[in-house]
Amino acid sequence: MSSGLWSQEKVTSPYWEERIFYLLLQECSVTDKQTQKLLKVPKGSIGQYIQDRSVGHSRIPSAKGKKNQIGLKILEQPHAVLFVDEKDVVEINEKFTELLLAITNCEERFSLFKNRNRLSKGLQIDVGCPVKVQLRSGEEKFPGVVRFRGPLLAERTVSGIFFGVELLEEGRGQGFTDGVYQGKQLFQCDEDCGVFVALDKLELIEDDDTALESDYAGPGDTMQVELPPLEINSRVSLKVGETIESGTVIFCDVLPGKESLGYFVGVDMDNPIGNWDGRFDGVQLCSFACVESTILLHINDIIPALSESVTQERRPPKLAFMSRGVGDKGSSSHNKPKATGSTSDPGNRNRSELFYTLNGSSVDSQPQSKSKNTWYIDEVAEDPAKSLTEISTDFDRSSPPLQPPPVNSLTTENRFHSLPFSLTKMPNTNGSIGHSPLSLSAQSVMEELNTAPVQESPPLAMPPGNSHGLEVGSLAEVKENPPFYGVIRWIGQPPGLNEVLAGLELEDECAGCTDGTFRGTRYFTCALKKALFVKLKSCRPDSRFASLQPVSNQIERCNSLAFGGYLSEVVEENTPPKMEKEGLEIMIGKKKGIQGHYNSCYLDSTLFCLFAFSSVLDTVLLRPKEKNDVEYYSETQELLRTEIVNPLRIYGYVCATKIMKLRKILEKVEAASGFTSEEKDPEEFLNILFHHILRVEPLLKIRSAGQKVQDCYFYQIFMEKNEKVGVPTIQQLLEWSFINSNLKFAEAPSCLIIQMPRFGKDFKLFKKIFPSLELNITDLLEDTPRQCRICGGLAMYECRECYDDPDISAGKIKQFCKTCNTQVHLHPKRLNHKYNPVSLPKDLPDWDWRHGCIPCQNMELFAVLCIETSHYVAFVKYGKDDSAWLFFDSMADRDGGQNGFNIPQVTPCPEVGEYLKMSLEDLHSLDSRRIQGCARRLLCDAYMCMYQSPTMSLYK
């Protein structure tokens, strides 16, 4: 299909606009008037009829032998004017236009358009109607009530109609809005109980409990539509594959014994298509001279052509509403007559058989070897003669498949966030459908893939200018039929090429694709047969997300239609963390952990550390509200318990929408601001949440000598750098800090959160810190029995000045029994030391501690929060083994560009265990760049280390 004119200039003065709308019946290839490059408008696009002011009508005068053309302003591209042949469009009324415009995927829009019954019922859906909503393909439909019907964004001449639905019963909590869209309250319902959807996600619950047909109706689903019979000798058109063929009506009536199916039409085609002999079930329906170009179709598959009288009128003709393309998808199992090229019963011929018949072959015959169709990929935005494939003139262009290429239908969930790709199927030499022997990447820019060994150091990627704003991480498409969709993983210019390429990662394997290599050089890494390389200028932003307008307010974006595919569950039942193998199976993978959004990594990683595999703070989730608590105490606690912690432990995933709800609550505190948008520190978050909102009993009670007990939730290590120390342990750092500040724990903590010595986020006091798996805090507790550092008896005195003495247990806190203390301080260099008595329980019998019976107070490391370049990630321990470590990043991957979505990921990192077995000397001498996997971040970027008491976790 081609057009006569394409203008990117704003359509104001040259044309009159009328409220008449048309839908394209097939993809249109057009030329940009300014750049002379080829552009495409997909099948299913909707245009508004315009008139040329200068001549009083909208048609380009036809050349000899050519038909008139209709002027359209494409609604999805409001500054574009397109002139198309009348046979390539069908008129639709304004009400249907509004319903269809809300469906952003043109292919799905076209499928719904063909289902007249379903579309007509959409007009009946109004506020108050009971409906069922399909949130995710393959899952149950949730009941609901329509609370809003209308446009979400009234920016065009005509706007798409969306339905705001309040979900009921089991659907409650499965939505993503409370009726607010971009700051406007369009209807009211409880939070997460509402959705905004287009008609294709909706089913009207009728009195007889029969719902609307499915999104892709089978061939029989629309046969009940009553259309008037066509006149004999009238001109008609029909869709064959991707082309429109014309012919003359020679028969129009019901079939004997099939009256309930409505009218069938016999057509004498202009081109040799079909071989119907005028008979059905042994009955001669009509007679004609030639049977080499005749077919029999249901009337719903026929597009009435324009009459001569109508073509002379100013207004373009009103074409038949229903245009069921014979090559389009549909059920192949319905036993209803469609078309036949022989005397066989059309009631026993399926849609695939019909496609064979229309291409001039019997169902059982081999497909034709020649075709006028071109089965290679044209380069988008360039002259069609210059294809992406750069195929030479002697390229063997096999005939197209005689069955339409299957198109992967998009799940509701995929339409929001995943990579719902459709792969173009290419014909094999025998005519069967198969993947292309060379992927688009291979055909577009190179001769052979296997000409050089894989290099590990690829050329540097470059950020070229791109008018479409595409970047690494953007969802992009290469517009073909069906299109290629992918996420851009790399952009740059390989050696020897003058073109800037984009490397896309596909979801489904495609023959000829690689695992991220191109011409033997690796540019990114993905699964085998999923890496596709194309010219960057051939890529466009993913058109399926065109209606998801950029939301300037990223806070409200969590409540927009875009996040519908990322919803997580609500779990009321209190759930302990799953440990060892069970926890590993739940937690690892992509879209696992807590989804990051808009500077939330500090909060995501902190919550994951505290609750994913530890119950030490679970009492925070259970304390009943008291009279002194803030008014939103219960709301916060319930949100944490049922929408964050419990779902994380059962399903391993929490969406950003839930975290944004918590961030909004944090901003209610007078002392807090910026929690919904700004980068924050974990300690600031913990202080607001624990102290101001939940009023958690302080985790730590610390006393400085002779002072009152100080309450806090975490401990920040302050100290001067010791150049003699290469790699300190957490044990050493904590003891140094307590000794230098003369501090003691007033009581043993159940949870100890230690903040590493830093100056701000960036400057680290030590290049590496060894996270002690076990922390002995016995010597840091007051009123606790302690062992003599020399004899092991009950210590009575402690000397801070002996701490650095290398002759006595270097690097250890020094406390001695009465006898050993006297002996130690007889040495000349210790004569002037000032030692202090150790505080002991008043009722402690001295004899109980004489023979090494003094217990130790140990704490276990359960999580480490790390930071690098202002981005927080987490390491958590899921089991007893030293290698039982998981790494969590709430923004590990990206689905789309600036207005895309973060994909959280949890990955096992058993290599951590091997490094924690190394000596401190070996770790110190080890180049950080040689540390494998995630272990480098654990050893080099630790920000907070979290310990729990194995015996006291139930009490605090």
Curated annotation (Swiss-Prot):
InterPro entries reported for this sequence: CAP-Gly_dom_sf, CAP-Gly_domain, Papain-like_cys_pep_sf, Peptidase_C19_UCH, USP_CS, USP_dom
Active site: 601 (nucleophile), 871 (proton acceptor)
Keywords: Amyotrophic lateral sclerosis, Cell cycle, Cell membrane, Cell projection, Cytoplasm, Cytoskeleton, Disease variant, Hydrolase, Immunity, Innate immunity, Membrane, Metal-binding, Microtubule, Neurodegeneration, Phosphoprotein, Protease, Repeat, Thiol protease, Tumor suppressor, Ubl conjugation, Ubl conjugation pathway, Wnt signaling pathway, Zinc
Annotated GO MF terms: cysteine-type deubiquitinase activity; K48-linked deubiquitinase activity; K63-linked deubiquitinase activity; Met1-linked polyubiquitin deubiquitinase activity; proline-rich region binding; protein kinase binding; zinc ion binding
Top-level EC class as recorded in UniProt: hydrolase
Outcome, altering residue 444 to A: Loss of phosphorylation
Post-translational modification: Ubiquitinated. Polyubiquitinated in hepatocytes treated with palmitic acid. Ubiquitination is mediated by E3 ligase TRIM47 and leads to proteasomal degradation.
Result of changing residue 871 to N: Loss of deubiquitinating activity
Record note on what altering residue 457 to A does: Abolishes binding to TRAF2
The organism's place on the tree of life at top rank: Eukaryota
Transmembrane domains' residue ranges: none
Residue ranges, annotated region (Interaction with TRAF2): 394-469
Stretches with biased composition (Polar residues): 330-349
Compartments where found: Cytoplasm; Cytoplasm, Perinuclear region; Cytoplasm, Cytoskeleton; Cell membrane
Keyword Cell wall biogenesis/degradation set for record: no
Tissues and organs where the protein is expressed, per its UniProt entry: Detected in fetal brain, testis, and skeletal muscle, and at a lower level in adult brain, leukocytes, liver, heart, kidney, spleen, ovary and lung. Isoform 2 is found in all tissues except kidney.
Biological processes per GO annotation: CD4-positive or CD8-positive, alpha-beta T cell lineage commitment; homeostasis of number of cells; innate immune response; necroptotic process; negative regulation of canonical NF-kappaB signal transduction; negative regulation of canonical Wnt signaling pathway; negative regulation of inflammatory response; negative regulation of interleukin-18-mediated signaling pathway
Gene3D superfamilies given in the database record: CAP Gly-rich-like domain, Cysteine proteinases
Residues covered by the USP domain: 592-950
Subunit-structure text: Interacts (via CAP-Gly domain) with IKBKG/NEMO (via proline-rich C-terminal region). Interacts with TRAF2 and TRIP. Interacts with PLK1, DVL1, DVL3, MAVS, TBK1, IKKE and RIGI. Interacts (via CAP-Gly domain) with microtubules. Interacts with HDAC6 and BCL3. Interacts with MAP3K7. Identified in a complex with TRAF6 and SQSTM1. Interacts with OPTN and SQSTM1. Interacts with CEP350. Interacts with RNF31; the interaction is indirect and is mediated via SPATA2.
Pathological association: Cylindromatosis, familial: A disorder characterized by multiple skin tumors that develop from skin appendages, such as hair follicles and sweat glands. Affected individuals typically develop large numbers of tumors called cylindromas that arise predominantly in hairy parts of the body with approximately 90% on the head and neck. In severely affected individuals, cylindromas may combine into a confluent mass which may ulcerate or become infected (turban tumor syndrome).
Family to which this protein belongs: Belongs to the peptidase C19 family.
Purpose: Deubiquitinase that specifically cleaves 'Lys-63'- and linear 'Met-1'-linked polyubiquitin chains and is involved in NF-kappa-B activation and TNF-alpha-induced necroptosis. Negatively regulates NF-kappa-B activation by deubiquitinating upstream signaling factors. Contributes to the regulation of cell survival, proliferation and differentiation via its effects on NF-kappa-B activation. Negative regulator of Wnt signaling. Inhibits HDAC6 and thereby promotes acetylation of alpha-tubulin and stabilization of microtubules.
Name of the featured protein: Ubiquitin carboxyl-terminal hydrolase CYLD
Taxonomic lineage from the root: Eukaryota, Metazoa, Chordata, Craniata, Vertebrata
